[in-house]
């Protein structure tokens, strides 16, 4: 079975594709903003209650009731007795508030892998372990926490990053499974109307806004049977076996993509999107004529690239120089028409016809420096331009520069 791509594991769109859903969201927006402000005030009281009351069944019940006012509804299967659940809870990662949701139905603590220790880390409900410099220090701190009498179970997310939960699970890290020979897996699904439950790469503040803005969000928790390590089973094998079990319960694939693959994909996507949709610069009729002059001299350069550079320079000579010296990259029109591989090339890959392509017979030509070749290319293009347009182009350049 072919494993899903990294892109399919992520939620990249906040808003729905259907026009009807977009219209409903637009009509709901005024009510949603009012609801957000009211819930923000109520949420402050929920935070105070969670700080004042000690961890108990009554506190969790009260917080669940108050959370329902915030539009957060939690349903779960029959809760297993504490002695059968174990000290390590393993869950898939859907949103930035998964640890808060699960703590409403079971006593547990979750360490943060990204939030720096301090007030914000404590206020978000994470377990503070001090400044952690490495994964080894984290594991030592967690082992010390587990050895303390009266300490609650640890809730860990081996995926380490959130996913859409629709197609697959990220590859489980092995370090959570080195803490104990028995773990308690549980699965989490999230449903929300009108918008996505969470968008990959967004901050937790943005997700909090949408949590309070949308009418309701339903979290469903399902407890799975405890899993014990087999004899001579390594941490990696143990982690993969639990991953397959949880993926089967969710009806998704257990992939080999890691959190680092997810981060790399999001980084590449952020850099590629602006490049794929460049903003067009409006040109005057004079600049349009100047672009045609450049096109006559450099026929391989597409007009879109010429327009873009002329919008910045306003000068024919400067634009020609930019293309000849490789300051502006473009896709030559000969490649586009021929259907060859669509990769960006610098003009020096194409506009080199005035000079011999093979091994020159003359020693002088063979020893031309790169700068001399550029100057030769520039002079050739300039000569072709002057032969075609003479002083007319110079006048239009001056008009364009004054405009």
From Swiss-Prot:
Pfam families, per this entry? CUE (PF02845)
For this UniProt record, the keywords arranged alphabetically read as follows:
Endoplasmic reticulum, Lipid droplet, Membrane
- Source superkingdom: Eukaryota
GO function term, MF aspect, one: ubiquitin binding
**Which residues does the entry place in the Cytoplasmic compartment?**
1-21, 43-399
Recorded hits in InterPro entries, A to Z, give:
AUP1_CUE, CUE
Q: Does the keyword Transmembrane apply?
A: no
Would you name any one GO CC term? Answer: lipid droplet
> Where would you find this protein in the cell?
Endoplasmic reticulum membrane; Lipid droplet
The CUE domain is annotated at: 286-328
According to Swiss-Prot or TrEMBL, what is its membrane topology?
Answer: Peripheral membrane protein
Please give a single GO biological process term from the UniProt record.
Answer: protein localization to lipid droplet
Keyword Membrane included in the entry's annotation: yes
The record puts the intramembrane stretches at 22-42
Protein's job: Plays a role in the translocation of terminally misfolded proteins from the endoplasmic reticulum lumen to the cytoplasm and their degradation by the proteasome. Plays a role in lipid droplet formation. Induces lipid droplet clustering.
Regarding protein family, the annotation reads: Belongs to the AUP1 family.
**Name used for this protein in its record:** Lipid droplet-regulating VLDL assembly factor AUP1
Q: Which organism is it from?
A: Xenopus tropicalis (Western clawed frog)
Q: Taxonomy-wise, where does this protein's organism fall, top ranks first?
A: Eukaryota, Metazoa, Chordata, Craniata, Vertebrata
